[in-house]
Amino acid sequence: MPVRRGHVAPQNTFLDTIIRKFEGQSRKFIIANARVENCAVIYCNDGFCELCGYSRAEVMQRPCTCDFLHGPRTQRRAAAQIAQALLGAEERKVEIAFYRKDGSCFLCLVDVVPVKNEDGAVIMFILNFEVVMEKDMVGSPARDTNHRAPPTSWLAPGRAKTFRLKLPALLALTARETPVRPGGAGSAGAPGAVVVDVDLTPAAPSSESLALDEVTAMDNHVAGIGPAEERRALVGSGSPPACAPGPHPSPRAHSLNPDGSGSSCSLARTRSRESCASVRRASSADDIEAMRAGALPPPPRHASTGAMHPLRSGLLNSTSDSDLVRYRTISKIPQITLNFVDLKGDPFLASPTSDREIIAPKIKERTHNVTEKVTQVLSLGADVLPEYKLQAPRIHRWTILHYSPFKAVWDWLILLLVIYTAVFTPYSAAFLLKETEEGSQAPDCGYACQPLAVVDLIVDIMFIVDILINFRTTYVNANEEVVSHPGRIAVHYFKGWFLIDMVAAIPFDLLIFGSGSEELIGLLKTARLLRLVRVARKLDRYSEYGAAVLFLLMCTFALIAHWLACIWYAIGNMEQPNMDSHIGWLHNLGDQIGKPYNSSGLGGPSIKDKYVTALYFTFSSLTSVGFGNVSPNTNSEKIFSICVMLIGSLMYASIFGNVSAIIQRLYSGTARYHTQMLRVREFIRFHQIPNPLRQRLEEYFQHAWSYTNGIDMNAVLKGFPECLQADICLHLNRSLLQHCKPFRGATKGCLRALAMKFKTTHAPPGDTLVHAGDLLTALYFISRGSIEILRGDVVVAILGKNDIFGEPLNLYARPGKSNGDVRALTYCDLHKIHRDDLLEVLDMYPEFSDHFWSSLEITFNLRDTNMIPGSPGSTELEGGFNRQRKRKLSFRRRTDKDPEQPGEVSALGPSRAGAGPSGRGQQGGPWGESLSSGPSSPESSEDEGPGRSSSPLRLVPFSSPRPPGELPGGDPLTEDVEKSSDTCNPLSGAFSGVSNIFSFWGDSRGRQYQELPRCPAPAPAPSLLNIPLSSPGRRPRGDVESRLDALQRQLNRLETRLSADMATVLQLLQRQMTLVPPAYSAVTTPGPGPASTSPLLPVSPIPTLTLDSLSQVSQFMACEELPQDGPARRLSLPGQLGALTSQPLHRHGSDPGS
């Protein structure tokens, strides 16, 4: 498995740090954005919500001035101070009365703290709220707790004065550190004094003065009082303030800026810009004298004042971590009492300058006062307020990242040392202790004088250094966070591998040197093998590689055989001196190689012979291949051999059993290829595909496999979350979206949506992408390679990189058909997007749609207009495309609000009076709204109202008969439908040719259902049904089908009723007709028949019946017949009809209008 690096991506820990520090202190705070209007609140904690009684949803996006907490007892000057602090990005404490949601009042101390980014710009504010006391427990405050300067309007114009101001509230707050007598006066050099010189004589502003806006009421502006509209405008303004509203800050917000920017002291404003004073800062009285002199250099400063002066500008108002770390040794700022004192009035009054000087006491730690103040106010301790930016995890000094290159190299070095320890420690303990030849070479030198002892000493030193490094190495906790705190690292290491590493690093040979216990030293040194556990854990990350796993298994097998060989020799060496029969394996080995042991136990084989023979025996036993030349003879040797066989069986099953799986994994790709190729060939054989197509299939499969290695890229992509899929698709299509002109200027969201719809296609040479006659359902963009377009055997175009081919997309027309074959000449990479997906994205981003259609230039139009009868040409599609697209967009934006219930039949909407200039739509009575079966004039369609298309369809009764010579008028379709009659709208001719079904004879019934044309005829489509038609993409298909079914059922009912009515009419006509005898007959006309045969209903004359009644019956359907070349057929009864009575014909009982 790979190394767990943890969450190492840069994170913005600003909010997490604030919440973590404040949760344990019961703080109540809000965070506001300084870069939006009114400094809107972007976060508030639960403590603030409990304090004010509002929920987080009610507080979010409110102005951070908290005007929603104001009430009758809220001080206006305090609210103005908060607004000025926000506007000037100043740190300030303000005591103000707020009201909860339930109306209760409380006195609150508000800390305003600006937050800066890495560039030093204020981007946020933190407002901390601390409840002083409930308002009902105290009366109205009699003290000015916000330390505002009183109005100075009482000063005479042109006279400069100095004055002393007692600040009881300030003295009370700072009495713990610097108590001041109420009437005491300080001096210029007193540490707790601030000297203020006021000169209100009009003078031109100097170059160092701060420009102040003109004001209308000096009293209000000096006191910070103004209308609520002015205060809101002050907060909403984007310009920084000219000066602060108060004479000086609160006791803990007393920092003075040397350059005069961001001052926290308040200045009184004059009535005009010319008389406004400027602010400059000094640390002592001699600085003021230098400023007065102008060109004179300042006298030498005290070391405590001037030492840190070059660093002030960089640290003022700083809240970053780096600034505090550099100056962490500076002590905290003491609480300072600021007093206005009368000091040397005559020289200052005689001074011609109009500057107002503010003298601060000499404090050597003033350089980082703002940061310290933030730390003190927010109680952040060592982890100060972070900058609002993406910050990498904080790494303490001398801390090593666990994934750093140095740690990786060090781990490999320790790995090699551990392998050395695993090999030579058992060998030294078994073969090199108490060897007679070693003792004879150096009788007076111990085991430590051996060459391997120096290497062992170096290994021990490296292990000790590794323990120290582990105490400073980061780790990943359960939350996938990188822990770099030294204390937490030490605790984690103590709970983990410290004990094992410590035992493995103890130099036992040095501790027990000279004691004569060499055997004990050798056994204790085997404790170094405990480090192999950590090595096994580190090597686990390579388990995903088959070759590495195979190599590690073989090394493990050899290492175990080495250890068992050392144990096998130790057993024989231990039994050899005490054995009388000389049957051990060492004696047999000596006899076999001609180096037997003598009677004193000396002689015998060499160490090399012993080790090789022991290793040979353990390997043959582990692999269950024993030749018998080295055999166990004693009981100890036999018991050990049994153990070796058991271990060997386990090793054989675990190691060599995995070899086949490892080899199979190495050839898994080849096996998958052959399996898939076998499926392709079986598919070819089963379907008997001819040889040319078979060859193309096999070539494409081989090329696709070599290109993708048999990996389904789409399946891999779908395994990631959608947001990551969009980023991946944006990267895959980056060259197309960046260099293709139609996609320039699109928003990031639009590009991500388009990238998700694009599909990448790879085509080898000779592959046919589009055949002649195929539907053009996609638009293709070539990113690499070249293609050719053929018509028959003729090459009509060759396209290359950055070319586009397809058809101009028409929102209404059906997809066109290709007029040629598209074949790849080289290896090509193409990006294609389906027309439906493209139209969907453009519909979601209408602002980008106009730019796309105007910039899209198709290199070659594949649409074949000859294959689609009646379809417009390419020039018509390109020329009228924008008009059609806008028409569709306006058509889609309509809201269909038909409250239509299932099973109801839509009714015809009411007709307008005066549908056309001829007045055909003007009819009287309730029947005047019926629709005509004849074609309506184009003029009538032009007067269509905007709301006509959405009017409900309702059934109306017959109207009174029209004059015989007038054709019945009708209502046209909606204006949008008529205007779209020149396009290939599939619904444009849905009701054409329906009016002929009301003809009485069979020739008309044959034309009842006509095939809808692909494109309507040039003549304007007649309007018979006032049904609101919408785009197929917006109106459900089932809605249209249900309306057509209802219409068909209505037609059938009307046809049945019409046939019955006509039969009744004919019977009545036969009864009422006068029998006229022939001229040659003498028969006279008979009189009236009996009463039983007299007609119940008188009838109207035949002409009236023909022109009016039949047309009224036909008006049940709001349909018109298709435009025809010949004149319109007029409905008439067959045969020659005589005169009838003048009585009107009554309607049948089954008539809907009865």
From Swiss-Prot:
Membrane-crossing residue ranges in chain numbering: 404-424, 451-471, 496-516, 521-541, 548-568, 639-659
A Pfam family hit: Ion_trans
Region (cNMP-binding domain): 742-842
Annotated GO CC locations: cell surface; inward rectifier potassium channel complex; perinuclear region of cytoplasm
Membrane topology reported for the UniProt record: Multi-pass membrane protein
Gene Ontology biological process terms in this record: cellular response to xenobiotic stimulus; membrane depolarization during action potential; negative regulation of potassium ion export across plasma membrane; positive regulation of DNA-templated transcription; positive regulation of potassium ion transmembrane transport; potassium ion export across plasma membrane; potassium ion homeostasis; potassium ion import across plasma membrane
Comp. bias (Polar residues): 258-269
Residues bearing PTM Phosphoserine: 239, 283-284, 320, 351, 871, 874, 1132
Biased composition (Gly residues): 916-927
Oligomer and partners: The potassium channel is probably composed of a homo- or heterotetrameric complex of pore-forming alpha subunits that can associate with modulating beta subunits. Interacts with DNAJB12 and DNAJB14; chaperones DNAJB12 and DNAJB14 promote tetramerization. Heteromultimer with KCNH6/ERG2 and KCNH7/ERG3. Interacts with ALG10B. Forms a stable complex with KCNE1 or KCNE2, and that this heteromultimerization regulates Inward rectifier potassium channel activity. Interacts with CANX. The core-glycosylated, but not the fully glycosylated form interacts with RNF207.
Protein family membership: Belongs to the potassium channel family. H (Eag) (TC 1.A.1.20) subfamily. Kv11.1/KCNH2 sub-subfamily.
Note on domains (UniProt): The S4-S5 linker acts as a signal integrator where it both couples voltage-sensor domain (VSD) movement to pore opening and closure, as well as providing a binding site for other domains that regulate activation and/or deactivation of the channel.
Protein name: Voltage-gated inwardly rectifying potassium channel KCNH2
Originating organism: Sus scrofa
Gene name of the record: KCNH2
